[in-house]
From Swiss-Prot:
Keywords: Disulfide bond, Hydrolase, Periplasm, Secreted, Serine esterase, Signal. Induction: Expression is not induced by the synthetic polyester poly(butylene succinate-co-adipate) (PBSA). Catalyzes the hydrolysis of cutin, a polyester that forms the structure of plant cuticle. Shows esterase activity towards p-nitrophenol-linked aliphatic esters (pNP-aliphatic esters). Capable of degrading the plastic poly(ethylene terephthalate) (PET), the most abundant polyester plastic in the world. Can also depolymerize the synthetic polyester poly(epsilon-caprolactone) (PCL). The keyword Secreted applies. This is Cutinase est1. Optimum temperature is 50 degrees Celsius. Optimum pH is 6.
């Protein structure tokens, strides 16, 4: 027969209290970890997932007609079919371009858990600052005038912009005017203004080494250098690529654009691994140069 002495009883009680306290501490620690990032969407990322033509989310489309668009030329909205809330991104084409030149980016980014509008501009000759206003109008449209299927999926506190060429210049301009944006990605950007020292929005600039329309030496690099080092920023220069690299499917542009948006729009640190220290560079790489203000 087992007899519990007062001393043994006290020991068992102490042990039970310790176990209960440890369990409570584990629960207390686990809960914040699970709730630390309510914006995290999708599976753990891999390089092959980001290089693929589409991500883990199925995508639907909605047309924004030119007649119904206020302040821009209409476009196409791409959004995940899964009911949830997502960050929203507006993308502008470049000089003489239309939404068709950036449609691949819209669908690709949406498939990673974003609502994206690829816009047409009012005229294909619109200058960068006009494109900035139109990107802003497109964000407003998604929040107020799009269908409920789109509006109900957008987290209005998490907005970003992208653009090619003069659309990239417009992206820089809007980023300088709207510090509440979560991210900006100018693609082979063009703008007469070379100084963007007032930008605080996390900015990824993608240039191309063979660009003769917006040479990196007089556009992308000065733009990047002028943004304060206190701002989260990165410069990626494509290897053996021209000004029009963003107009066709490009796995490097797709991968690092998604990683940047995930990191700063979704605050998803799972994607930091792709940005810091960043891609391999050199003759055998798709990236000629990469620099940043890591760590992010």
């Amino acid at each position: 027969m087992s007899v519990t002495t007062p001393r043994r009883e006290a020991s068992l009680l102490s042990r039970a209290v310790a176990v209960a306290a440890a369990a409570a501490a584990t629960v207390a620690l686990a809960a914040p970890a699970q709730a630390a990032n309510p914006y995290e969407r999708g599976p753990n990322p891999t390089e092959s997932m980001l290089e693929a033509r589409s991500g883990p989310f199925s995508v639907s489309e909605e047309r924004a007609s030119r007649l119904g668009a206020d302040g821009f030329g209409g476009g196409t909205i791409y959004y995940p079919r899964e009911n949830n809330t997502y960050g929203a991104i507006a993308i502008s084409p470049g000089y003489t371009g239309t939404q068709s030149s950036i449609a691949w980016l819209g669908e690709r980014i949406a498939s990673h858990g974003f609502v994206v509008i690829a816009i047409d501009t009012n005229t294909t000759l619109d200058q960068p600052d006009s494109r900035a206003r139109q990107l802003n109008a497109a964000l407003d449209y998604m929040l107020t005038d799009a269908s409920s299927s789109v509006r109900n999926r957008i987290d209005a506190s998490r907005l970003a912009v992208m653009g090619h060429s003069m659309g990239g210049g417009g992206t820089l301009r809007l980023a300088s005017q709207r510090p509440d944006l979560k991210a900006a990605i100018p693609l082979t950007p063009w703008h007469l203004n070379k100084s963007w020292r007032d930008i605080t929005v996390p900015t990824l600039i993608i240039g191309a080494d063979l660009d003769t329309i917006a040479p990196v030496s007089s556009h992308s690099e000065p733009f990047y250098n002028s943004i304060p080092s206190s701002t989260d920023k990165a410069y990626l220069e494509l290897n053996n690529a021209t000004h029009f690299a963003p107009n066709i499917t490009n796995k490097t542009i797709g991968m690092y654009s998604v990683a940047w948006l995930k990191r700063f729009v979704d605050e998803d640190t799972r994607y930091t691994q792709f940005l810091c220290p960043g891609p391999r560079t050199g003759l055998l790489s798709d990236v000629d140069e990469y620099r940043s203000t890591c760590p992010f």
